Amino acid sequence: MKKGIHPELKKAKIVCACGAVYETLSTKEYMTVEICSKCHPFFTGQRKFVDTEGRVERFTKKYNWEIK
């Protein structure tokens, strides 16, 4: 590797919306994430309800579809 062209790595603190905190190396010192392995449905085995009604309504209005 060439010297002097790579960004400096620092200890990074990553905080999830569920409250989980992770430490790793990164060029940034602090990051926030919305979902992690402690709260993601794939890893927890639970399903979470995601409100997508606004997106569906926008789609049906855009393409003039009727919901049956």
UniProtKB/Swiss-Prot annotation:
Protein purpose: Binds the 23S rRNA.
- Necessary cofactors: Zn(2+)
Q: Which GO terms describe its biological process?
A: translation
| PANTHER family according to UniProt | 50S RIBOSOMAL PROTEIN L31, CHLOROPLASTIC, LARGE RIBOSOMAL SUBUNIT PROTEIN BL31C
- What cellular-component terms does GO give this entry? ribonucleoprotein complex; ribosome
The entry's Zn(2+)-binding residues are C16, C18, C36, C39
Question: How many cofactor units bind, and how?
Answer: Binds 1 zinc ion per subunit.
Tell me which PROSITE patterns the record gives.
Answer: RIBOSOMAL_L31
Family, as annotated = Belongs to the bacterial ribosomal protein bL31 family. Type A subfamily.
Is Cytoplasm included in the keywords of this UniProt record?
Answer: no
One term of GO molecular function: structural constituent of ribosome
State the oligomer form and interacting partners.
Part of the 50S ribosomal subunit.
- Matches recorded under Pfam families: Ribosomal_L31 (PF01197)
Name the keywords, alphabetized: Metal-binding, Ribonucleoprotein, Ribosomal protein, RNA-binding, rRNA-binding, Zinc
Record keyword NADP present:
no
User: What name does UniProt use for this protein?
Assistant: Large ribosomal subunit protein bL31
